[in-house]
Amino acid sequence: EICACLVGSEMCIRDRSGENAAYYKAAMSGNRRRSDGSLIPGDAMFVQQTAGLSQPLGEMCPYVYEHAWSPHLAARYEGNPPELPVIRQGFEAVCSRNDYVTVEGSGGILCPLRAENGKTLWLEDVIRALQLPSVIIADAGLGTINSVVLTAEYMQGKKLPVKGILFNHFHRGDTMEEDNIAMCRQRTGLPVLACIPDGAQELPMEPTDLAALYEEVSLT
């Protein structure tokens, strides 16, 4: 199956290209409740509606929390802490029915998904377990050099494959933002895959270039 960690909005392009596409996220917090008390997986709903996916919301994310906290803290207060086997099972089920699966990260690479009773689970553990190549998503503005370089060097040091960088909220001609991008490229050695302007509805990449970011993942 072909899976990758990419920005969720790319699904708009992939879905319209005629391929069978899907979305997956291990855990998401900061979600509203329906009138019946059940939680609405907000990020998943946004992708579903934006991309016009027929994929059911219920299979997009196995762990959904109300508090807008790091997932580990939300789970500590609300219960139902993330379990890696459950995350993997859900991912494999989505992969079995789709050609392309986009996996969105839960916070940054060092986001804790679980930390209680001596059990810990970090986003990097999920990426490694699911054998996902990744794309770093970053804001083009002030402070991005430090966050991008630290993320890239951490992932490279942990032998987690990184395909490149996508910059959000980009303003062409902005001196600082263009320098930020150049410095990130120079220091990390990673390609800049695209710079996404504010308000863009689609990822400014050719479908063939986008598809090349995905890799076949052996699921056993």
Positions of predicted regions on the chain:
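Short internal beta-strands
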Residues: 25, 135-138, 163-169
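Switch II (G3) loop of P-loop NTPases
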Residues: 87, 91-118
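Charged helix-capping and loop-helix junction motifs
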Residues: 116-124, 149-152, 177-182
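Inter-motif core of Ras-like GTPase G domains
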Residues: 116-140
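Single conserved hydrophobic/aromatic residue that forms the stacking wall/gate
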Residues: 1-8, 12-13
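C-terminal lobe/tail of nucleotide-utilizing enzymes
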Residues: 153-220
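Hydrophobic anchor at the start of a short beta-strand
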Residues: 20-21, 101, 134, 162-163
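N-terminal phosphate/diphosphate-binding loop that engages ATP/GTP or pyrophosphate donors
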Residues: 14-81, 85, 92-93
